[in-house]
Amino acid sequence: MAPSLSPIRSHHVAVIGAGAAGLVAARELRREGHSVVVFERQKQVGGTWIYTDHIEPDPLSVDPTRSVVHSSVYGSLRTNLPRECMGYRDFPFVVRSGVSESRDPRRFPSHGEVLAYLQDFAKEFAIEEMIRFDTAVVKVAPAAEEGSGKWRIESTEKEKKKWAHRAV
C-alpha cells in the first residue's frame, strides 16, 4: 500500500521583490494554498525591467545622503534572448491580441515590452493584490522564538514595520 500524503499546511510566506522570479514565486505559493505577501520597493511590478532615465547625482558615492537610483536598464536595451525563451510555460511571451498597438512584436523585445509582459502576468493571476508597493525590506533574520521556523522581516513604508513569516 502506498504511503498516504499528508496535506500541505498553509503558511504565511514572504516574497521579496515583484520582478520576474518574485511574481511567479508568489503565484505558485498561493496555488499551494499559502498566504503570500510580496514586498516591493518600487511603485510597480517589473523588477530590473523598470526603466528610469534618472541618474545618480553622486556617481562616485561620496555623499552618504545621496539619492540612489536602482536601475540597470538603459533606454535602447533589447533582450539578448528571444521572447520564446523568456515566457512562463503557462503564460507564453507572445504579442497578445486586443492590447495596445504600441507593443513590440519583435522576437528580441525591448525592456518596455518585457515590463508590459510582467504587468500582464501580474494582472492575469491577480498578484498585485498580494504586493506591498513602496516597501523596502531592510532586514531579515530568524525569529526570536527558537525552533519556530519563522523569520522576522523589517521593512520601511512610511514607517518601519516588523513582520513574522514562516518562509522568505
Swiss-Prot record:
Physiological role: Catalyzes the conversion of methylthioalkyl glucosinolates of any chain length into methylsulfinylalkyl glucosinolates.
UniProt GO MF annotations: flavin adenine dinucleotide binding; N,N-dimethylaniline monooxygenase activity; NADP binding
Transmembrane segments: none
Positions bound to FAD: 17-22
Assigned protein family: Belongs to the FMO family.
Origin species: Arabidopsis thaliana (Mouse-ear cress)
One Pfam short name: FMO-like
Disulfide bonds, paired cysteine numbers: none
Cofactor requirement: FAD
Name of this chain's protein: Putative flavin-containing monooxygenase FMO GS-OX-like 11
EC assignment: 1.8.-.-
Sorted UniProt keywords: FAD, Flavoprotein, Monooxygenase, Oxidoreductase
Domain of life: Eukaryota
